[in-house]
């Protein structure tokens, strides 16, 4: 019974918050809200600068490699397990996967954002 009350309360609260977040921004839309703000001055240039998609892809690739390397951080604690062969196999497999992924990105020129 307590589980049902908790689930119903959470669902109701989430639905209420999503509804409020959906309808609230549409109440007061005027031109000053949609214009860029630079410390009270008129904008010197366009606030919508072009963004390099190649740089974005390099940044995402870096983030993925960084997260994969973070998987190696618990290895010193994992080395104290009784089954050392499994731990070493998984660690070497992860390092091999990182090396192959880096080689693939390098050969496909995915790490260069200048042309």
UniProtKB/Swiss-Prot annotation:
Q: Gene3D superfamilies from the xrefs?
A: NADH:ubiquinone/plastoquinone oxidoreductase, chain 3
Q: Does the keyword Acyltransferase apply?
A: no
Q: Which reaction(s) are listed as its catalytic activity? A: a ubiquinone + NADH + 5 H(+)(in) = a ubiquinol + NAD(+) + 4 H(+)(out)
The portions of this protein that span the membrane are 3-23, 55-75, 84-104
Q: Which UniProt keywords apply?
A: Electron transport, Membrane, Mitochondrion, Mitochondrion inner membrane, NAD, Respiratory chain, Translocase, Transmembrane, Transmembrane helix, Transport, Ubiquinone
The UniProt entry's GO biological process terms, in alphabetical order, are: mitochondrial electron transport, NADH to ubiquinone
Q: Any idea which GO molecular function terms this record carries?
A: NADH dehydrogenase (ubiquinone) activity
Q: What EC number(s) is this enzyme filed under?
A: 7.1.1.2
Q: Tell me a GO cellular component.
A: respiratory chain complex I
- Tagged with keyword tRNA processing: no
- Pfam families under this entry? Oxidored_q4
How does the entry describe its membrane topology? Multi-pass membrane protein
Q: What is its main location?
A: mitochondrion
Family assignment from sequence similarity: Belongs to the complex I subunit 3 family.
Protein's UniProt name = NADH-ubiquinone oxidoreductase chain 3
Species, as recorded: Ovis aries
Q: Which gene encodes it?
A: MT-ND3
């Amino acid at each position: 019974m307590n589980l049902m009350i908790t689930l119903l309360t959470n669902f109701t609260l989430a639905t209420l918050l999503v509804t409020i977040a959906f309808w609230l921004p549409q109440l007061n839309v005027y031109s000053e809200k949609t214009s860029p703000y630079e410390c009270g001055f008129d904008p010197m240039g366009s606030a919508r600068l072009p963004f390099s998609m190649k740089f974005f892809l390099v940044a995402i690739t870096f983030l993925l490699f960084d997260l994969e390397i973070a998987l190696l951080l618990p290895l010193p604690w994992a080395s104290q397990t009784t089954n050392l062969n499994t731990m070493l196999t998984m660690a070497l497999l992860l390092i091999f996967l990182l090396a192959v992924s880096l080689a693939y990105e390098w050969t496909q020129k995915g790490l260069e954002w200048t042309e």
